[in-house]
A protein has these predicted regions:
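Nucleotide-activated donor-dependent transferases that construct or modify glycoconjugates
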Residues: 3-17, 92
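Glycine-rich beta-alpha loop elements in corrinoid/cobalamin-binding modules
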Residues: 32-33, 41-49, 70-146
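Charged, often glycine-rich, active-site loop that binds/positions anionic groups
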Residues: 49-75
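Proline-rich low-complexity regions
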Residues: 9-10, 22-23, 90, 132
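Short, hinge-like loop/turn segments at secondary-structure boundaries
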Residues: 23, 58-64, 138-141
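A short, glycine/small-residue-rich beta-strand->loop->alpha-helix junction that serves as a flexible
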Residues: 12-24, 97-102
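Residues that mark the start of a beta-strand
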Residues: 1-4, 39
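Short catalytic helix/loop segments, enriched in acidic residues and glycine
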Residues: 21-34
Length: 146
């Protein structure tokens, strides 16, 4: 069957912190896919191997750095995420979305499409459900699950 990688894109890492919990929604999807013969895995691109988190003041002080990542698509984090996805050798990549990470998904999906054009990319989650124009916002993504 298919190799599927379900991705929680980075967000908190841009603000000098991280998010080490798994996304429950994509965990449910991976479980269902695995139970039906697919090889599905999760990739939390916000994961950092440390126990301490930045407080809100520290995160807000990093906002200018956050904006810089979106002005520099050659930043290490973009290449890191795309390389991790490629290492998995997926047939399908699914992204969980909320409004704050749609630009992140756009950059990652475009870079991935350049490197692996045969990989099918899907966006789901809150933003994809609520915004009927989501595929216009992330044109490298092939399908939206609403």
């Amino acid at each position: 069957m298919s190799r599927v990688l379900l991705v929680n894109p980075p967000f908190y890492r841009f603000l000098g912190s991280h998010y080490n919990a798994s996304s429950l929604g994509i965990a449910y999807i991976a479980s269902h896919l695995n139970a039906n013969g697919h090889d599905a895995w999760l990739y939390n691109a916000d994961y950092v191997n440390r126990q301490s988190y930045a407080n809100l003041d520290e995160m807000f002080s990093q906002y200018s750095n956050y904006k810089e990542y979106f002005n520099n698509e050659d930043a290490d984090i973009w290449n890191e995420v795309v390389e991790k996805i490629i290492e998995f050798q997926p047939d399908w990549v699914g992204y969980t979305s909320y409004t704050a990470n749609v630009n992140t998904i756009d950059i990652i999906s475009r870079k991935l499409k350049q490197r692996l054009p045969s990989v099918q990319q899907i966006i789901g989650g809150v933003h994809a459900t609520l915004d009927p124009r989501v595929l216009e916002e992330v044109p490298a993504v092939d399908f939206a699950v609403r």
